[in-house]
Amino acid sequence: MSLLQKIPRKVWRFLDIINRLIKKDKESIFIYSNLGFRDNIKAIFDYLIENKYNSEFRITVSLNNYEEYEKTYQNLNIPNIKFVSNLKGVFSFFRCKYCFYCFGKYPIKPAPGQVVFNLWHGMPLKRIGNMVKGCEKVNYNYFTHLLCTSEFFRDIMKKSFNCSDNEIVICGQPRTDNMLNSQAPVKEREIKARIISFNERKNKMILWLPTFREKSADEFDILSKEQLESLNQMCINRKYTVVIKPHPLSSFKAEDFNDYKGIKIITDQRLDSLGINFYSVIRYSECLITDYS
C-alpha cells in the first residue's frame, strides 16, 4: 500500500476544502499516474509536446516512478516540463487548471472552474466501480469529465462512476491514435528489429496479450510446456514470431521464455526503454490473441 493510500478519508475531505481555496493557474497542466508513464496519459503528454503546448503551458507529470523520466527529459532540454512524485504532485494538483489521469487518482473533488479529466484505460467488459458487488456506495467520482468511447458505453460508465450525462465525453482513446496513424514515426521492420531481432525483422508477428490473473501460475495455463515447445517450433518453421506482453501487474518471469526462439516477451518497461509505443506494435501485428480483462 502506498503512502497516499494510507491517508484517512477525513484528511482528503480537508484537502477538498484546500483545493477550493487555492487559485488555479490557467497556464498549467497536471498529469497523474500511479501505475507508470504509459497508456492514455502518456498519449496525452506526447500530443502536448508534439504540438508545442509546453510553449504556452507549464506541464507537471506526477508518477510513482518519476525518477526514471526526470533526468531523461532534462537531457532533452524540453522547456516547461517537470516530473514529481505522487506525494509532491498533490501541491501541483491544487494549483493546476487542467488535470488528466487514467490510473489511480487523488480523491480530491475538483474546485469550481478546475477541469479534471478521467481518461480511464479502456471500456469495461466486466463490472467496474460502483457496479461491482459491495462497491455500490464507494465514491469514484473525482472528476469533471469522463472519457467514453461510444454511446453504447454511456450508461455503463455513468453507473460505474456515478456521474451525469454532462460529465461524459464521447471520444476515442488517445492511446489508439498511434495504432491508427498512417504517419507513425517508427516503421514496421524497425519495430520488429528492436523487439524481436534484426534477423527476424521480416517475420510475421503474432501479439499475445494474456489478461491479469490473481494467481501468476494461471497466466499461461492454456499451454503446457510441450505445447509451448510445439508452438515455438511451428513459428520458426513458418517464419512467425509470437510476442507476449504480460499485464503490467503480472509477476511472471520473462527469463522462463529465453529458450524459445519463436516466442518473445516484451514488457512496458522494455518498450519504454526502446522508445516504442505499444500501439505501434499492435498496428504491425498480423494477429492479436487476448481475452477480456
What are these model-predicted stretches?
Residues I29-N181:
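Active-site and donor-binding regions of nucleotide-sugar-utilizing enzymes
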Residues F83-C96, P248-S293:
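Donor nucleotide-activated moiety binding/catalytic core segment of transferases
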Residues C96-Y101, S182-E190, F278-R283:
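Short, surface-exposed amphipathic charged segments that create phosphate/polyanion-binding patches used
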